[in-house]
Amino acid sequence: MIVLATSEGVKLGRRLAEELDAELAPVEEDRFPDGEQIVRVPPELDGTVVVVHSMSPPQDENLVKAIITLDAARENGAEEVIAIVPYMAYSRQDRRFEPGEPVSFRAVARAVSANADALITVDLHEPGTLKYFDVPAENVSAAEELGKYLAERFEGEDLVVIGPDEGARELAREVASICGVEYDHLEKKRLSGDEVEIHPKELDVEGRTVVLVDDMIDTGGTMVEAARALRDQGAGTLYAACTHALLTRNAATRLLASGFEDIIATDTVPNPFEKVSVAPPVAEAVENLSG
C-alpha cells in the first residue's frame, strides 16, 4: 500500500501513512503557462493506492486537482484506488433549492467516483448524501478524536459542550460523551449566507468553560452569534471547535475578537489552528474498505 498526498492533504497523509505502516509519496504539482494544473505521481504504481486530498478553498481548483490526481493514480498502474477526501466541497448544495438548479454535490460525487474504487470522507455535512457516490463510501466522525483532546486539555475544569444549532447537536453529544461531560445546543435562524440569529434558550453555562462545536466553521457568523448568546447567560471561557476549519472572510479574527479564547480544529483542511488529527478513524476506514 502506498499513500499519495497532495499539498492540501500532506499533513493528514503523513499521519495516515504512519497509522497504516505504508509508504508516503507526495504528489508533484505544477501549472501550465495558462494556469491549468498538472500533477505527477510515481510511475509504475501497483496494489492499493490511497490518495489523500482535501477540497478546501479554492474549492473549484481543488475539485479539479482531486479528479486529475485520481486519474493519474489509475493510469499509472494502481489496482485499487481509495480516495480520502476529508472535506468534500459543495456538500451544502445537496438538494435543488430553486427551479433550474443542479444538485451540485451529486455532480461532484460522481466526478470523484470516476477513478476511485472506494471513498472516505469526514463529518460530511449531510451523511445521507453518501448515496450520491458511485462507489462504496464511508463517512467517518472526528468526534472521538476531538473528545479525547478536550478531555485531556480541560481535565478538572467544569466543562460543557454546546452545539451552536440543531444540526450540530449530534456532534456535540458524541464529543461530550467521550469527554464525560454535559452537552446542549442552541437554536438559530439563518438570515443570509453569513448572518444568523440565535434564539434565546436557557442553558446551564454560568461560570463554566464552554466549547462550541460544529462540523465546520466557514465565515464564523454562527459561532460569533452563539458566543454572544452564551456570554449573556454568564458563560466563562469560550472555545470554538470544529472538524473543518475553512475560516473564510477573516473568520479567525472575528472569532477571537468576539471573545473566544482559542479555536480547536482537525487536519481535514490546512489551517493554523489544527490540534487534532483524524488519521486514526480514517486509517480504520481504509482497512475496512480495502479489498
From Swiss-Prot:
Predominant localisation class: cytoplasm
Keyword Metal-binding part of the UniProt annotation: yes
Active site: 188
Residues that bind D-ribose 5-phosphate: 190, 214
UniProt cross-references to SUPFAM superfamilies, sorted A to Z: PRTase-like (SSF53271)
One of the GO biological process terms: purine nucleotide biosynthetic process
GO cellular component, one term: cytoplasm
Cofactor comment: Binds 2 Mg(2+) ions per subunit.
Ranges in coiled-coil conformation: none
Cofactor(s), names only, from the UniProt record: Mg(2+)
Binding site for ATP: 34-36, 92-93
UniProt catalytic activity: D-ribose 5-phosphate + ATP = 5-phospho-alpha-D-ribose 1-diphosphate + AMP + H(+)
Residues reported to bind Mg(2+) 2: 165
UniProt-annotated location(s): Cytoplasm
Binding site residues for Mg(2+) 1: 125
SMART domains per the UniProt record, alphabetical: Pribosyltran_N
Keywords of this entry: ATP-binding, Cytoplasm, Kinase, Magnesium, Metal-binding, Nucleotide biosynthesis, Nucleotide-binding, Transferase
Role: Involved in the biosynthesis of the central metabolite phospho-alpha-D-ribosyl-1-pyrophosphate (PRPP) via the transfer of pyrophosphoryl group from ATP to 1-hydroxyl of ribose-5-phosphate (Rib-5-P).
Name this protein carries in UniProt: Ribose-phosphate pyrophosphokinase
Species in which this protein is naturally found: Methanopyrus kandleri (strain AV19 / DSM 6324 / JCM 9639 / NBRC 100938)
Lineage summary: Archaea, Methanobacteriati, Methanobacteriota, Methanomada group, Methanopyri
